[in-house]
């Protein structure tokens, strides 16, 4: 049985994935190129290279907009293709830790992975500010408050962390 573990950050501009077992970090532009509104032609950096240069029948866009999922089906296809390419197709039974923006609905991000063809073992949702604090090697479980500022492509989030959670964001 496969025991891959992935940490995912779905940003408006970049998709960032950490693969724990391989200790590798993958970052791609969060873009997809769709031909005739039905066929995914390219994704990630390859689709970004087509941005504003594609003919009318090829739409190049981001599946995320201001931290919200604009297209769950294209995001699922993008994520699955990207992970299969970089893990040699061994996704069944993987665990996913998803950095969740505080103003987002949990259901859409859970569905993004659970309803895909990847058949994950588990999907864990983590507040994005807590994930950022852990990524910065900050002890977020202390009683002392820590301010974390996440400056993204379309949104900026200021949060105070204490005792393993988000106090205010």
Model-identified regions with their sequence ranges:
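Nucleotide/phosphate-binding catalytic cleft detector across ATP-hydrolyzing
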Residues: 1-12, 16-41, 46-148, 161-169
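Gly/Ser-rich catalytic serine loop of serine hydrolases
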Residues: 152-154
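A structural feature that tracks compact, well-ordered secondary-structure segments
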Residues: 157-159
């Amino acid at each position: 049985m496969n025991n891959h573990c992935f940490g995912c950050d779905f940003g408006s501009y970049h998709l960032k994935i950490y693969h724990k077992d391989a200790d590798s970090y993958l970052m791609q532009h969060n873009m997809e190129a769709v031909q005739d509104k039905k066929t995914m032609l390219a994704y990630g950096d390859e689709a970004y290279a087509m941005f504003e240069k594609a003919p009318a029948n090829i739409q190049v866009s981001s599946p995320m907009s201001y931290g919200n999922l604009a297209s769950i089906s294209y995001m699922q296809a993008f994520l699955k293709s990207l992970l299969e390419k970089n893990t040699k197709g061994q996704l069944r039974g993987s665990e996913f830790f998803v950095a969740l923006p505080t103003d987002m609905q949990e259901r859409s991000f859970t569905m993004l992975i659970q309803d895909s063809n990847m058949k994950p073992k588990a999907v864990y949702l983590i507040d994005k500010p807590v994930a950022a604090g852990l990524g910065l090697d900050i002890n977020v479980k202390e009683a002392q408050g820590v301010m974390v500022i996440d400056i993204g492509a379309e949104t900026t989030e200021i949060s105070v962390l204490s005792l393993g959670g988000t106090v205010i964001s």
